[in-house]
Amino acid sequence: VIALKLPRLTGFCHRLVRPFAAAAAGALLLTGLGFDQSASARARDNLAIATPFEVGDSPAGNYLAALIAGAERDTLAAATFFRETLRYDPRNPELIERAFVASLANGNMPDAFGLADRLLQREANNGLAHLALGIRAIKQHQYPGARNSLSKGGAGRQRDITATLLTAWSYAGAGDYKRAIAQVDRLKDEGFGTFRDFHAALIADLAGNVAEATKRFQAAYNSEKSTLRLVDAYARFQDRHGHRDEAIRAYEAFDQILPRHPIVTAALADLRAGKLLEPLIRTADQGAAEVLYGLGAVGGRQGDELAAIVYLRLSLYLSSKNGLAIITLADIFERLKQYEQAIEVYDSVADDSPLRVNADIQTALLLETLGKTDEAQKRLQDIVNEKPKNEEALTALGNLQRSRKQFVDAAATYTKALELSSKPEKSLWSLYYYRGIAYERQKAWTKAEADFKKALDLFPDQPLVLNYLGYSWVDQGTNLDEAFKMLRRAVELRPTDGYVVDSLGWAHYKLGQYDQAVKELERAIELKS
């Protein structure tokens, strides 16, 4: 619901999904690397780089370290070790390509562009190198050169949409809006329909062609109302052209799909305060960045993480303040367990962005994952002190307090979060559930039971709540019939959750139903293993 849906990534970045580790065995064979020792001696001083990593003197060792880092998507380490290896054999095209890709993924654009130039001297049809240089040309407003680079490279549907839309934005940058829209309309594939209309609308809006922009925005919005980026652009356009009520309606409709998204919340607050919303895209650079952001977000959802990282890095090169692109990139690093890199990316969200608080919350949660619990809790407490009505921050702080067994503080924090809502909503079930756990751990069972029941009122058949309340009743020897119904229902809803099945097994055990207990407990062990 954040970025537009597209067919699976291929094309310019299709080579990126080749696992780095596939060539790891070659690192053990110096002859496989083809090192040119005389060339390396001439190049080493010129290519020396500062690095936080301790690199060795062995080319094979550095190459192996680079491959492992690449396989683990540790982009900083991969870039460092590939560049170090390249010092020993500066004309090796495979090393140049790997160092180039790693530099792109790490966001080191000066290095990446220099390596792209070198790579194309040895491999003239490298699509990703052409893409990178095309984007550099757009940034430098060298639009004919950009189109020349974008016209080269591999084939494939994703390469077609990338090159087509970036070429369109190069025409827009040159002021040739008619040709830009004609270029967008070359995308005939029905799977690209919404993307086509979206970018045609953005270009028409930039050109001041209100009639064309209105038609294209309406077509894109009518086909995809659950995509934040499209809804945001559509609503901003409507507001600037005298349709504030429609802008509010569009945001409120999206809020029903994804409640309380900070971008929507901020936009609605501005609209209700009488402020005029700025357009989503104000320059050709931002338009081209939007293409790359959309493709990167798609790649991240599809599991093509390296391609997604590269597209997002290129997007941020063109438009460094796009908070959604930053958050999407950080989220990918987080999913790859590259927590330090994720924190670094989260920290680059602008202070005035609606996403700043969310980035700070995610950073705090990652600090806890890294074992820096005190620092994490301080960060969350600072956010809550500054933004006492931010439900996400209060929830995160409550969860951290609960994980640290600070149950009294956790319950108080959850209460503050619940007090922010004027009416009960289904989405609040988790807050009642978490507060119920905090009360139960304090031995305040009456309060805990009331919260669990409230959670089930808001979300009947929620398996986690059924499991917790049902097991608690069995443990206390009360409401046994209803408790077993709850536990069995929880297992029906989550039959592969070993912890839920385990609760049912222990409930049988507590009541002396040992045969049934053994059956469920053995199944729980299998599911957990």
What spans do the regions from the language model cover?
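Position-specific recognition of the canonical hydrophobic site in helix A of tetratricopeptide repeat
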Residues: G70, L104, I138, A172, ...
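TPR alpha-solenoid repeat register
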Residues: G61, L95, A129, A163, ...
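Canonical tetratricopeptide repeat
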Residues: R98-A99, A132, L166, H199, ...
